[in-house]
From Swiss-Prot:
Taxonomic lineage of the native organism: Bacteria, Pseudomonadati, Pseudomonadota, Gammaproteobacteria, Enterobacterales
Record-linked InterPro entries: CusB_D23 (IPR032317), UPF0194_membrane_YbhG (IPR022936), UPF0194_transport (IPR050465)
HAMAP family noted in UniProt: UPF0194
Any one of the GO CC terms: periplasmic space
UniProt family annotation: Belongs to the UPF0194 family.
Signal peptide: 1-16
Alphabetical list of Pfam families matching this protein: HlyD_D23
Source organism: Escherichia coli (strain UTI89 / UPEC)
Predominant location category: periplasm
Keyword presence, Calcium: no
Coiled-coil regions listed: 108-209
The protein, known as: UPF0194 membrane protein YbhG
Annotated gene: ybhG
Subcellular location: Periplasm
Domain of life of the organism encoding this protein: Bacteria
UniProtKB keywords: Coiled coil, Periplasm, Signal
Length: 332
């Protein structure tokens, strides 16, 4: 009969030990697990045309989901198409001029220049002889000083024409100067740059979505004349999804880049999202008011960016999130 109370006593002791051990294990797990509070990062971007013009069409409205590469709107293309045609013509002219400079002068052009020199030489010889005769007549007082001056002027003009023809023939025979060829090449490159700019302007008269997102606001309507850079849409970026949280200096060593964490929301308290710390701010700041940790309000903390690896549409920007550290986060 004495054995029964002993057995019961042993059972009670064992049960108490199990309960105490379980409580100790639970407490140790809780103490080792760091909990932070943050929000799904709000990331928006203002979309605009890089060039100005009249809005021709807009393909999306507020609330629409957009995909990267999707056409969102277009300006009137006509002014940019005309500018492109002008730029192409400018390249053609500059290319032809450059090719002429490289090719040099033809034999026919050299022969014509030589003939021009011969003709200019004859004209100069005649003018020089005439001036010489006029000098003799002026000395004998047969002509006036004005007549002599006219003869001298004709001689000087014929001499200038001869020199110009000789210089031209010399240039034709030696080919174009390197400086002239370089100038023609520079003109061609300038025309090509203007063509590239015209092509880019035409391309930028179509507004393309840079990434996936949701359209928050549509600031203009078709027919609006915009200056370059004027906001057309405001888009909320949906990928990747980031959580912004803050950690105090005491726990900073636990929040290392690459560390895996669990993310809980009020709508999914029993089914966490998975995340990985991607960035830890190198500078401290005071805890923002949006962080729901009253005991840390006046503490200096470090901002974390946590990338959600299994995000879905249920995670909305600005949503409060609980960040759980611990062994279970690192092994799931």
């Amino acid at each position: 009969m004495m054995k029964k109370p002993v057995v019961i006593g042993l059972a009670v002791v064992v049960l108490a030990a199990v309960v105490a051990g379980g409580y100790w294990w639970y407490q140790s797990r809780q103490d080792n697990g760091l909990t932070l509070y943050g929000n799904v990062d709000i990331r928006t971007v203002n979309l605009s045309f890089r060039v100005g013009g009249r809005v021709e069409s807009l393909a999306v409205d507020e609330g629409d989901a957009i995909k990267a590469g999707q056409v969102l709107g277009e300006l009137d293309h006509n002014p940019y198409e005309i500018a492109l045609m002008q730029a192409k013509a400018g390249v053609s002219v500059a290319q032809a001029q450059y090719d002429l400079m490289l090719a040099g002068y033809r034999d026919e052009e050299i022969a014509q220049a030589a003939a021009a020199v011969k003709q200019a030489q004859a004209a100069y010889d005649y003018a020089q002889n005439f001036y010489n005769r006029q000098q003799g007549l002026w000395k004998s007082r047969t002509i006036s000083a004005n007549d002599l001056e006219n003869a001298r002027s004709s001689r000087d003009q014929a001499q200038a024409t001869l020199k110009s023809a000789q210089d031209k023939l010399r240039q034709y025979r030696s080919g174009n100067r390197e400086q002239d060829i370089a100038q023609a090449k520079a003109s061609l490159e300038q025309a090509q740059a203007q063509l590239a700019q015209a092509e880019l302007n035409l391309q930028d008269s179509t507004l393309i979505a840079p990434s996936d997102g949701t359209l928050l606001t549509r600031a203009v309507e078709p027919g609006t004349v915009l200056n370059e850079g004027g906001t057309v849409f405001t888009v909320s970026l949906t990928r990747p999804v980031w959580v912004r949280a803050y950690v105090d200096e005491r726990n900073l060593d636990q929040a290392q880049p690459g560390r895996k964490v669990l993310l809980y929301t009020d709508g999914r308290p029993n089914k966490p999202y998975h995340g990985q710390i991607g960035f830890v701010s190198p500078t401290a700041e005071f805890t923002p008011k949006t962080v729901e940790t009253p005991d840390l309000r006046t503490d200096l903390v470090y901002r974390l960016r946590i990338v959600v690896t299994d995000a879905d549409d249920a995670l909305r920007q600005g949503m409060p999130v609980t960040v759980q550290f611990g062994d279970e986060a690192g092994h799931e």
